[in-house]
Design a protein with these regions (language model features):
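A conserved beta-turn-beta hairpin within the catalytic core of GNAT-like acetyltransferases
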Residues: 77-89, 99
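Conserved acetyl-CoA-binding loop-helix of GNAT-fold acetyltransferases
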Residues: 89, 94, 100-113, 125
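Active-site rim helix/loop that mediates acceptor-substrate recognition in acyltransferases
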Residues: 19, 23-64, 69-73
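C-terminal "cap" of GNAT-fold acetyltransferases
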Residues: 147-185
Length: 185
């Protein structure tokens, strides 16, 4: 292991006590002009009171047993009549000092495994096609899902589904209230 790499001790489900460290992680990982918006999203996703219909799951990666260096949220997505049809991956962050070491990939792989074992094995993401494409996300898997707002970067709207579980009919997406802000899309 090179001196720039860190011993990763665990990938685990996040707890309430992790929220302050996760917020600090996002402050370090995102550009200044995006930080407050991302912090609001994380806080709302973490709160059980902001959305009774859509649940959110959080995972963190720690280094040296205690320092949180990565975070990913996966929240449920539904149709207009509140039928769950899968998950949306947002946000994902790794502290800059630990980027390039595969931690983001480890979190995404874990989220995919979780979703594929669930009763709705599908994940949507609005992000970098080059990064998410490495995991099997593609635009075709998201073509039947209308996002809640017009996309500023349409190529970033991608999905991944278990074989045979692709959406056959168009749906209009509903997601956690934390993600229902036009400026995020």
């Amino acid at each position: 292991m090179s001196s720039g790499q860190t011993s990763i001790s665990s990938l685990r489900k996040a707890s309430e006590q992790d929220l302050p460290a996760v917020l600090q992680l996002h402050r370090a990982a995102f550009p200044a002009e995006e930080v407050e918006q991302i912090i609001q999203v994380v806080n709302e996703l973490w709160s059980d009171t902001t959305d009774a219909t859509h649940s959110a799951l959080h995972w963190v990666i720690t280094a040296h047993q205690t320092t949180i260096v990565g975070h990913l949220s996966l929240s449920s997505i539904t149709t207009q009549d509140n039928q769950m049809v899968g998950w949306i991956l947002a946000p994902l962050a790794v502290v800059p000092t630990h980027q390039g070491q595969g931690l983001g990939s480890e979190l995404v792989d874990h989220a995919i495994r979780h979703a594929m074992r669930s009763h709705q094995p599908r994940i949507l993401v609005y992000g970098d096609p080059a990064f998410y494409g490495r995991f099997g996300f593609d635009r075709q898997q998201a073509v039947n899902v209308k996002p809640p707002f017009p996309l500023t970067q349409p190529l970033g709207w991608q999905g991944i589904s278990a074989k045979g579980k692709e959406l056959q009919h168009p749906i209009e997406l509903r997601c956690h209230a934390a993600l229902m802000h036009a400026q995020l899309w």
